[in-house]
Structures are given as C-alpha cells and as structure tokens.
Curated annotation (Swiss-Prot):
InterPro entries associated with the record: FAF1_2-like_UAS, Thioredoxin-like_sf, UAS, UBA-like_sf, UBA_8, Ubiquitin-like_domsf, UBX_dom, UBX_domain-protein
Protein's UniProt keywords contain Endoplasmic reticulum: yes
Species of origin: Bos taurus
A Gene Ontology cellular-component term: endoplasmic reticulum
Organism placement in taxonomy: Eukaryota, Metazoa, Chordata, Craniata, Vertebrata
UniProt protein name: FAS-associated factor 2
Matches recorded under PROSITE patterns: UBX
Length: 445
C-alpha cells in the first residue's frame, strides 16, 4: 500500500519525490512533496533552492526561511573509505607532535571563536548563492593557476545540472569538495587528483564536478553531503531510479588507492546502471512501438476521414447537380408557362381579321420554319407589329423569329428598334394586296 505522502502521484512524480529525498536527506516525505510542488516538480530548481535556504537566507522560489539542507550520511548502503593521517613514529616524531599540539589547539580554537563571533557581525556570504556557475568557473581558474592545467575535466555547471546530466546519460558523477584551509588539500590536488592515471580514469568513466567550500555553491553542496574531513569525494549515480550517493572517500588518498576505490565502487554498482539502461531501452522501444501504433492509427483515421470527406463531397456534388437540374426544369417550366401566357395575351389583343371584300385588306401567306403555311388578312393601316403578334401567338411558330419579304429581299421591322422606334404600317412597308412572307427562326442565335 502506498504511503500517504505518495497518494495521487504519477509514477514520474513519485520517482522525483524519492530522488529529491535521497539528494537532500529530508526525512519528511510531506516536506519533500511540498517543496517539489512549490517548484512545479522541477527537481533541479528544487534542489538548487534547498541549497540556498541556509540560516535565514530567503529562498529564491519560497520566501519563508527553512532549516539547513541535510543528507543522511549514516545510510549503511553507502560505501565509505576514510584515510586517516599517519601517527607520529619514533621519539623525534612524537616530540615534534607534542610540541606542536598546543599551538595547533590554540590556533584552531581561536580560529573557531573568531568565525563564531564573525557570524553575529557579518552573515556568512556563502549562504547566498548568486552565481553558482561563476563559482565553478572561478574555482577551476584558481585550481589551474595553482596546480596546472593537467587535471580531470571539470563539469562547468551547477551541482543540480551535473546530477541531471549524470542521470540522463546514466553515468557516474564524482563530486570533489575542496577545503582551501585543509593541510592535505594541496598534496591531494597536486599528487593525486592531477596524476595522469587518475585523470584518465575520471575522464573516461564518469562526470567530474568540483568546487571549493569557500564558494557559495560548494558550501551548499557541503551542507548537503556533510563531509567529515578533506579531501572529500562522493560518487553519485542513478540507483533504483534515484540519484544516490554510493561511495564516500575522505582523507589524503594516494593515486593507486583512489583508482582502486573508484573502480571498486563502479564495479559494485555497475549492475544498477546496466539494469536502468535496459529498462530505458525497453521503455524507449515501448514508446517507439506505441508511437508507431499511434501514427498507424492516425494514418488510418486520416484515410477514413479522407474517404468520408470524398463521399460527402460526392454526395454534395450530386445533390447540387440534382438541385441544379431541378431548378433548370422549374425555370424551363416557368419560361414555357410565361411564353404560353404571352401567346394567349397576344392572341386576345389581335384586331379582327378584315373581310376578303375589304379593298384595304392584305392577304399574307406565311411560310413557317417547319415548312407549314399560314394565311391571314390584315389591314393596310395596321402596324407590322400586328403581323409579329399574330405569328407569335401561333403554336407552330418559334419563340424568337424575324419576318422576311422576298421581292425585294428584306427583313421587315416588326418590332421597335433604334432605326424604327415605331414600326411602319403594312402600306408604309410597301406590301401589296397579296404577299408571301418567310418566318426565320432566331431562337438559337
């Protein structure tokens, strides 16, 4: 059953919670979760912020002060290797040791009292981290000025960034905390850390992060790792999905001994990295497979959607076509109906046909486009428009036509035009008592 602090958490958040607790040493799971939630589960920002919360210094992300960061150094799973300073040998050595003992005691006592009193006058500037990367670069430059440029490759980034890179790359992270005032620091850096075989091992097998405890960034990491003496080295790696301190090396260690201890720690914990690497590969393969399945599903979905879209477009095209045909049919019906009504109206408005005995009458024989003939009498005084209206009212006549005379061959102006605003009468048009006129179909023109 999950702990109360881990309820309602995703797997990724649970892993970050456990990793944050392991790196900071905070025993309360509630406090760890609260801190991570304040930083939106950004573990790098949370760890860096915890390193800033020392002795009343405000947090960058959380203004209320908090207790100093702690690391559980009593974990029996952490491999520890401590090199003690050699005891004096012989009468001369013991004599020198006894003579110097009071001076050393007095010196360190006065130094501690001075530092303690100074804390009340001026807060320790190391409590405020303003430029963590600048602290690393500054330490590297001072290291090279003092011990030369032949040294392991320094990680130029914050402690939290180094942790994240080691986790992402599944590599060991070796952390070195430099005590400037310690008597063994110079000898360790010059003879051990800068030894060619040590440089080769560190550069090829792990990331190397180092800083002086006199720098704010180094001091914060020192508060987290809680070294007992200097020189101090801590080996950190991803273990059980958490960045974990798996080895601590303290004291003046010689190059061969350092290589043996680092190799032992790596060999003892290599299986965790191999296991994590296999799990990552499996997760990546699962993710790739899921992505391929999702892509195949999306491709199939897009294909189905495209088919459905084409079907809809085809249905819409057919619907519009049918609607267009129907509209055309209705329009044609309306046109024919209007035409028929117009024919009937023209027929009703025609003047009576003159009698054959009327000397002012004209007998006209019309030859229609279908070769049929129609005969009717008109009065000389009537307009040519009457002839057009008569032909228009006939069922056999075309919808649009013109009337032509044969001798001489000409088109009769039966309808108003620019040349003939008022069509002439039959007499004015020069028609005789008997005429044959031809009806020419203009419907398709």
């Amino acid at each position: 059953m999950a702990a109360p602090e881990e309820r309602d958490l995703t797997q990724e958040q649970t892993e970050k919670l456990l990793q944050f607790q392991d790196l900071t040493g905070i025993e309360s799971m509630d406090q760890c979760r609260h801190t991570l939630e304040q930083h939106n589960w950004n573990i790098e920002a949370a760890v860096q912020d915890r390193l800033n919360e020392q002795e009343g210094v405000p947090s960058v992300f959380n203004p209320p002060p908090s207790r100093p960061l702690q690391v559980n150094t009593a974990d029996h799973r952490i491999y520890s290797y401590v090199v003690s300073r050699p005891q004096p040998r012989g009468l001369l050595g013991w004599g020198y040791y006894l003579i110097m003992l009071p001076f050393r005691f007095t010196y360190y006592t006065i130094l501690d009292i001075f530092r303690f009193a100074l804390r009340f006058i001026r807060p320790d500037p190391r409590n405020r981290v303003t430029d963590p990367v600048g602290d690393i670069v500054s330490f590297m430059h001072s290291f090279e000025e003092k011990y030369g440029r032949a040294h392991p490759v320094f990680y130029l980034g914050t402690y939290s960034q180094a942790l994240n890179d080691a986790k992402r790359e599944l590599r060991f992270l070796l952390v070195y905390l430099h005590g400037d005032d310690h008597q063994d620091s110079d000898e360790f850096c010059r003879n051990t850390l800068c030894a060619p075989e040590v440089i080769s091992l560190i550069n090829t097998r792990m990331l190397f992060w180092a800083c002086s405890t006199n720098k704010p960034e180094g001091y914060r990491v020192s508060q987290a790792l809680r070294e007992n003496t200097y020189p101090f080295l801590a080996m950190i790696m991803l273990k059980d999905r958490r960045m974990t301190v798996v080895g601590r090396l303290e004291g003046l260690i010689q190059p061969d001994d350092l290589i043996n201890q680092l190799t032992f720690i790596m060999d003892a914990n290599q299986t965790y990295l191999v296991s994590e690497r296999l799990e990552r590969e499996e997760r990546n393969q699962t993710q790739v497979l899921r992505q391929q399945q999702d892509e195949a599903y999306l491709a199939s979905l897009r294909a189905d959607q495209e088919k459905e879209r084409k079907k809809r477009e085809e249905r819409e095209r057919k619907r519009r076509k049918e609607e267009e045909v129907q509209q055309q049919k209705l329009a044609e019906e309306r046109r024919r109906r209007n035409l028929q009504e117009e024919k009937e109206r023209k027929l009703e408005c025609l003047p009576p046909e003159p009698s054959p005995d009327d000397p002012e009458s004209v007998k006209i024989i019309f030859k229609l486009p279908n070769d049929s003939r129609v005969e009717r009498r008109f009065h000389f005084s009537q307009s040519l428009t009457v002839i057009h209206d008569f032909l228009f009212s006939l069922k056999e006549s075309p919808e649009k036509f013109q009337i032509e005379a044969n001798f001489p061959r000409r088109v009769l102006p039966c309808l108003p035009s620019e040349e003939w605003p008022n069509p002439p009468t039959l007499q004015e048009a020069g028609l005789s008592h008997t005429e044959v006129l031809f009806v020419q179909d203009l419907t398709d023109e």
